[in-house]
Regions:
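Cys-dependent protein tyrosine phosphatase-like superfamily
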Residues: 1-88, 102-140
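A phosphate-binding catalytic loop at a beta-strand-loop-alpha-helix junction
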Residues: 88-98
C-alpha cells in the first residue's frame, strides 16, 4: 500500500483477511478498480465488499480494464476525493487506481504537481502529461 496524497492510498489486490487491518488503520472507504475474473486467483468483488461492510467500511466498485479510462470513473473518483475519507483504492498493481486519482486531482492541482506526487509514490505517468493537461483544460 502506498500513500498517494493526504487520505488517498493505492494498493495491489487486497484479500478479505486484509480488511480488519484496514479498519484498525481507520480506513473509511475501499475503492475497487478491478473487474471480477481479471485473474483466476483473484478474490471476488463480493467477497471484499462483504468484509468491508461487516467492518463498517464503505465499498465502491469502479472497474477499469487496463487502458480503458472513462469519464464516468474519473468523475466518481472525484466524488470520493471530495469526501476526504481515508480511502484505499486497489487494482492489480495500484497503477490504474493511481491514474484515476491523477485525472481526478487535476481539478485541484496543476498537472506538474500531480505528476510530481505520483512519481514520488512510485508511479511515473510522464507519458500521460499531455492527456492530463487536455483533461484539465476541458473539465474546468
Amino acid at each position: 500500500m502506498k500513500r498517494i496524497y493526504k487520505n488517498f492510498y493505492a494498493a495491489h489486490q487486497i484479500q478479505a483477511k486484509d480488511i480488519a487491518q484496514l479498519k484498525q488503520e481507520k480506513f473509511e472507504c475501499v475503492l475497487c478498480n478491478r473487474p471480477d475474473n481479471e485473474e483466476q486467483d483473484q478474490p471476488s468483488v463480493e467477497m471484499i465488499k462483504s468484509q468491508c461492510l461487516a467492518n463498517g467500511i464503505e465499498f465502491l466498485h469502479l472497474p477499469i480494464t487496463p487502458g480503458d479510462f472513462n469519464l464516468e470513473a474519473i468523475m466518481e473518483t472525484e466524488k470520493v476525493l471530495k469526501t476526504a475519507k481515508k480511502t484505499l483504492a486497489y487494482c492489480r498493481t495500484g497503477t490504474r487506481s493511481t491514474m484515476l486519482w491523477a485525472f481526478a486531482k487535476t481539478k485541484d492541482l496543476e498537472v506538474d504537481e500531480v505528476l510530481k506526487i505520483t512519481d514520488h509514490s512510485g508511479y511515473n505517468f510522464q507519458h500521460l502529461k499531455e492527456l492530463l493537461e487536455t483533461y484539465k483544460s476541458t473539465s474546468s
